[in-house]
Amino acid sequence: MDIERPAAYVRNRALKTGSSMSRSIPIPLRTRLLVGGSLALAIANAFAVDATPPSVGAWQFLRPHFYGDRELGEVDESFMHVEAPGSTPDPAATPVALHFGKEAVGKIKQVRVVIDNNPSPVVATLDIGAGQPIAEIDFRVRVDRATAVRAIAETTDGKLEMRSAWVRAEGGCSSPPNASGEGKIGDVRFRPSEDGTSLQVSVRHPNYSGFQIDPKTGDAIPPHYVSHMQLTTGGKPLLDIESGISISENPTFRIVSAQPIATPVTLEASDSKDAHFSATWNGAADRAVAANGTR
């Protein structure tokens, strides 16, 4: 797992910006906050990676909501495992990596990431393009307190498999925002590997959680976050991401593929204020990005 913090962003054209958002929390987010906020359950002080967590926190409510009574398997790490630090020095930017083994590559169609004890426990839903040989997905999250971080994968044959990791943290969802997230919203950076098998995509955005305080006014900062990112490669779906406030500011996703990632790669993104952003990367040799958001 090696997510680099974006040092600079590419100026990108905002395609569409909606009207000012009401200070109220959108209904889907409000539902998630109520699920997480109603819980006052403690987690034992055990932080082994890929352990089976107890049925505590939001998971006991989320499991039947998303999966009903479907059987949920506990695969070993040769199929999938979750990598996260047992104790994070920065709870507002905790690295998480989802690793998929050879048996899983090309056979997982969706992964839902859940942080049990976050106020918004559903971190992201990741839909992998059909046939895409994705072997790893890395990103950074906010962690509000000691919790299980879960990845629930649905395979192409309809099976559900889960792995998890323990993380000790405190206050990630209310940590003060950094100035780096308050620049030109929607600026995009692509960072490819030399061999073309991995690509990091970053969007400049504050991703306000709704639990942060404006240091100048003392008022709560309303939630404002990237809600959807769609990546296509060579005109085919690569990864579709639905996300919320548990993703760290300046949302960054790194994709590792078992094969070189075809170009061009296009990102279409939108946020909770209905702003839309688009940018395209045309290949490793093409390093510069024009002001219109096309690489």
Identify the residue ranges that each predicted region occupies.
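Cleavable N-terminal signal peptides
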Residues: V35-G36, A46
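Short, positively charged and aromatic/hydrophobic N-terminal segments
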Residues: Y9-R11
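A general "mature secreted/periplasmic domain" signal
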Residues: V49-E182, D187-G196, Q200-T266, S270-T294
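Residue-identity detector for glycine
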Residues: G18, G36-G37
